[in-house]
């Protein structure tokens, strides 16, 4: 029973970490990354489709993305979708491909992005702590139902605490890497 509670907590904490990584990977750091365009949707013959499903997006250099559309007839719609997105990107049509140059980040924008990343990290930590609380509550229920002893309860809660601290350290490590990336570019 206790192993199931611990494993469930670890799986849920790992999902929190993956969500955090996914959220911060979409932030523009000055370095080209195809994930920047994940939220761009394009009108494709009456259906709203993600750009990623309509094109191949590759990194040409550190500050340029190249978009090669599967259907060239929608090139203007894709250009418009990129322009109206709130990413501050300007597409450049070059025949059958679209190049997107990433402008360099201003100091103010860097500080703003660091605040956003720190906030995302804090939300991740809160989620991890909530998972710890849920696991501890389940352990207390087992104690109340006399399924485990007081010693087992304390040992289990100590284990859960160590697991929580490990996942929070991982979150902090990813946070510091992202902050360094934002400062360096």
Swiss-Prot record:
- Kindly list the places in or outside the cell where this protein is found, as annotated in its UniProt entry: Cytoplasm
Which organism encodes this protein? Baumannia cicadellinicola subsp. Homalodisca coagulata
Lineage, opening ranks:
Bacteria, Pseudomonadati, Pseudomonadota, Gammaproteobacteria, Candidatus Palibaumannia
Q: Name one GO molecular function term.
A: ribosomal large subunit binding
Q: Which gene encodes it?
A: frr
Record keywords: Cytoplasm, Protein biosynthesis
Any single Gene Ontology cellular-component annotation: cytosol
Q: What name does UniProt use for this protein? A: Ribosome-recycling factor
Q: What does this protein do?
A: Responsible for the release of ribosomes from messenger RNA at the termination of protein biosynthesis. May increase the efficiency of translation by recycling ribosomes from one round of translation to another.
Question: Tell me, what's a Pfam family for it?
Answer: RRF
Q: Which family does it belong to?
A: Belongs to the RRF family.
Instruction: Please provide the Gene Ontology terms (biological process) for this protein.
Output: cytoplasmic translational termination
């Amino acid at each position: 029973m206790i192993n199931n509670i611990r494993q469930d907590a670890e799986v849920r904490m790992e999902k929190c970490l993956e969500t955090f990584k996914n959220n911060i990977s979409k932030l523009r750091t000055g370095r080209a990354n195809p994930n920047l365009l994940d939220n761009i949707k394009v009108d494709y013959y009456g259906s709203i489709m993600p750009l990623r499903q309509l094109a191949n997006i590759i990194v040409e250099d550190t500050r340029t993305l190249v978009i090669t559309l599967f259907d060239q007839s929608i090139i203007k719609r894709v250009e418009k979708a990129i322009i109206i997105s709130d990413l501050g990107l300007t597409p450049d049509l070059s025949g059958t491909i679209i190049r997107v140059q990433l402008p360099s980040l201003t100091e103010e924008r860097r500080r703003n992005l660091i605040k956003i990343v720190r906030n995302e990290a804090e939300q991740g930590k809160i989620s991890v702590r909530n998972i710890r609380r849920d696991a501890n509550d389940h352990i207390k229920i087992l104690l109340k139902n006399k399924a485990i002893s007081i010693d087992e309860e304390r040992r289990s809660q100590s284990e859960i605490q160590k697991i929580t601290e490990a996942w929070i350290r991982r979150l902090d490590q990813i946070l510091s890497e992202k902050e360094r990336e934002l400062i360096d570019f």
